[in-house]
């Protein structure tokens, strides 16, 4: 029976070109990358795109501080971000940028279509203005108390505590983050998107199961009041795209940022003629579209974005997968505590696969924060990856190489044990598919325990010393290495580099779910090389000490 290949497009939220990628960002990129690798392992066509979120006053101001044009800052950060993501084995088909001709063209197209439908209107508003710096203050450069929940020291556009969005003028006791001055109010004409026109569409879309239940319930709270029109413009000076036929007015960064997903695919379609842009984005598309995002940007992705897409005649996402924040040793990441760990700093000291595994062992389909506890991290890596998984291969490989010239036996002594490992495939793939990686890891490690128990019971090291037990030693170790092959296939989305090393050692084709069932028998393997090093506490300690 052949199953038709799924055509899937996956995006991760665009890192902002204003600073380094840290381990909090990596939760999402690793989560998405594991899912993409799993889909490919299942034989599905899965494109994976991302890019640099390149616009906004924050970029402009950071560039000024560094004495660079904004374009140069964006190019520099794009290079650094691509390096760090690549270092963590995140394999994008295209890592592009929102400061691109494709994004300008698509932003103008979507804006024009919305305007032609009557969804855009102009209104004079009172805006926060820094009298010292003589600049209209972007939302993120105003801090104050949330008008909805009363949380202090919140941004001017969104509360990180309750998730409310609001205009900066609604903030209580605001101050400029640039000068510390109390902003004054100044009038300016802005353009608004009539989000309330899409209330029924959004309610229906949210009810249709495109979001995790927790997220859907949270969004429904926002419908208790009328959805407010969304301010999509900003005044010069600003780094971004000018709004057509509107002097000194620019698209707000959050208008063109998600359009960057489309632009990245459009750019990829120019590089790869086989990639059809319309197949993924046209209205009524039968392909699948998934966005991986953090809980802090749900409002933009699950309300504004579907409304914009619908209004402009494009397809809506199949699902938006939302994850929580990362804490380190139980607390919010902090530079003063040494727990603000950049991706680059981590990669200077440790293997990316350690963190990929640790995150996978913690991630679920829930919108829960996960904690990087360094003691637990060391223990998990050493107990699971080294003590259970790698140890299984190292216990068997030496006998096969030394005593049998690298040749495996021609049959399995315990085919039922092998079959029982295969029977967990559906459970594990269901867990991967539903983002319940922690459950998948638990099942895989319980299999590793069983495989090691088998070797413990058969004691090939003792058999090797007995007369006429050579065939039994070869058979036991062949069984062990074939169980190891299954475990490696199951772990491959999480540990791609290790899986490649295992394929080389086993001298076999690329491991995937299609060839999972076929054991390696009467087959020559290569000499075994160490797959991973034990994680030393002093090495891990360097993460929190510059």
UniProtKB/Swiss-Prot annotation:
A motif ('KMSKS' region) lies at residues 332-336. ATP binds at residue 335. The keyword 4Fe-4S does not apply. Keywords: Aminoacyl-tRNA synthetase, ATP-binding, Cytoplasm, Ligase, Metal-binding, Nucleotide-binding, Protein biosynthesis, Zinc. It is an enzyme of class 6 (ligase). Is required not only for elongation of protein synthesis but also for the initiation of all mRNA translation through initiator tRNA(fMet) aminoacylation. Monomer. This is Methionine--tRNA ligase. The gene is metG.
């Amino acid at each position: 029976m052949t199953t038709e290949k799924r055509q899937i497009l996956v995006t991760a939220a665009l890192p902002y070109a204003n600073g380094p990628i840290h381990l909090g960002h990596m939760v999402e990129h690793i989560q998405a990358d594991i899912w993409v690798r799993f889909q490919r392992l299942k034989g599905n066509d899965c494109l994976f795109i991302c890019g640099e979120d390149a616009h906004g006053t924050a970029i402009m101001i950071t560039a000024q501080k560094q004495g660079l044009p904004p374009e140069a800052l964006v190019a520099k950060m794009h290079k650094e971000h691509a390096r760090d993501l690549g270092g963590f084995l995140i394999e994008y088909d295209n890592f592009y940028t929102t400061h691109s001709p494709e994004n300008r063209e698509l932003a103008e197209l979507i804006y024009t279509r919305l305007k032609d439908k009557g969804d855009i209107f102009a209104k004079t508003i009172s805006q926060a203005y820094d009298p010292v710096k003589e600049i209209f203050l972007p939302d993120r450069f105003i801090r104050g108390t949330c008008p909805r929940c009363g949380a202090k020291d919140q941004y001017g556009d969104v509360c990180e505590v309750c998730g409310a969005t609001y205009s900066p003028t609604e903030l209580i006791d605001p101050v400029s983050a640039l000068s510390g001055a109390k902003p004054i109010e100044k009038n300016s004409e802005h353009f608004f998107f009539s989000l309330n026109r899409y209330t029924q569409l959004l309610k229906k879309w949210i009810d249709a199961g495109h979001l995790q239940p927790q997220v859907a319930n949270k969004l429904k709270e926002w419908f208790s009041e009328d959805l407010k029109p969304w301010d999509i413009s900003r005044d010069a000076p600003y780094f971004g795209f000018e709004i057509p036929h509107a002097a000194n007015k620019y698209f707000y960064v959050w208008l063109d940022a998600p359009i960057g997903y489309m632009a990245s695919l459009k750019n990829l379609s120019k590089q790869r003629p086989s990639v059809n842009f319309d197949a993924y984005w046209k209205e009524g598309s039968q392909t699948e579209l998934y966005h991986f995002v953090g809980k802090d940007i749900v409002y933009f992705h699950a309300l504004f974005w579907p409304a914009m897409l619908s209004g402009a005649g494009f397809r809506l996402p199949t699902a938006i997968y939302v994850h929580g924040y990362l804490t380190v040793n139980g607390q919010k990441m902090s530079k003063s505590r040494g727990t603000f760990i950049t991706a680059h700093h981590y990669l200077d000291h440790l293997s990316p696969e350690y963190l990929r595994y640790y995150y996978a062992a913690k991630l679920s389909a829930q919108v829960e924060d996960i904690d990087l506890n360094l003691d637990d991290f060391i223990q998990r890596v050493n107990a699971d990856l080294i003590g259970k998984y790698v140890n299984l291969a190292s216990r068997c490989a030496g006998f096969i190489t030394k005593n049998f010239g690298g040749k495996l036996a021609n049959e399995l002594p315990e085919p039922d044990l092998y079959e029982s490992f295969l029977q967990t495939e559906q459970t594990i793939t269901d867990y991967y598919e539903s983002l319940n990686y922690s459950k998948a890891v638990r099942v895989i490690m319980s299999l590793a325990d069983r495989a090691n128990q088998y070797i413990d019971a058969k004691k090939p090291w003792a058999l090797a010393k007995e007369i006429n037990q050579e065939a039994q030693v070869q058979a036991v170790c062949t069984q062990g290495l074939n169980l190891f092959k299954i475990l490696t296939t199951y772990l491959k989305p999480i540990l791609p580099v290790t899986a490649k090393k295992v394929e080389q050692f086993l001298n076999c084709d690329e491991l995937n779910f299609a060839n999972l069932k076929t054991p390696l028998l009467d087959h020559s393997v290569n000499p075994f090389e160490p797959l991973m090093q034990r994680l030393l506490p002093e090495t891990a300690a360097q993460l929190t000490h510059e």
